[in-house]
Amino acid sequence: KNQRRILSESKPSAMARPNQPSAESQSQFPLMEEIRGPLSDRAALAESQRCLYCYDAPCIHACPTGIDVPTFVKKISTGDVTGAAKTILTANILGASCARVCPTEVLCEGACVLGHEYDPIQIGLLQRHATDFVTARGISVLDSPAKANGFRVAIIGAGPAGLGCAADLAAL
């Protein structure tokens, strides 16, 4: 831990990432507060503009769900937060949950090219920003389920894999 802190303190600050939790992160239930609050709109914009938008982005390969990270980050940087959420949720129907629980520091953020010299892009917080944006506004970014075709499927288990499978099958 101490070595990690020393390394992060020695990194150049020219590409310092903003870490300004929004006012929404303040909860009336202090024991229920999240450890890392959401980014404000301004902080999300600044953070997204730090991205290098790599051609063969290692963050995509490091993501277990294969989310196109540079695309959704670029959409946030251009103000298309709804489009960013669509990119995320099309690849991973549980993108809003994963933004909170996925160990991004060892997956996509751990693979971030920018992380070699500076702090990596806060991909998890940007993902959370985009998915929270559409959820808070009641915006539906996914296509409606396909019409019934007469086939029925039973999925055993209601964990992430079962829910993801059900969503994919409903689109067929």
Q: What is each model feature region?
A:
Residues 2-152:
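Ferredoxin-type iron-sulfur electron-transfer modules and their immediate structural context
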Residues 152-172:
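N-terminal Rossmann-like FAD-binding beta1-loop-alpha1 element of flavoenzymes
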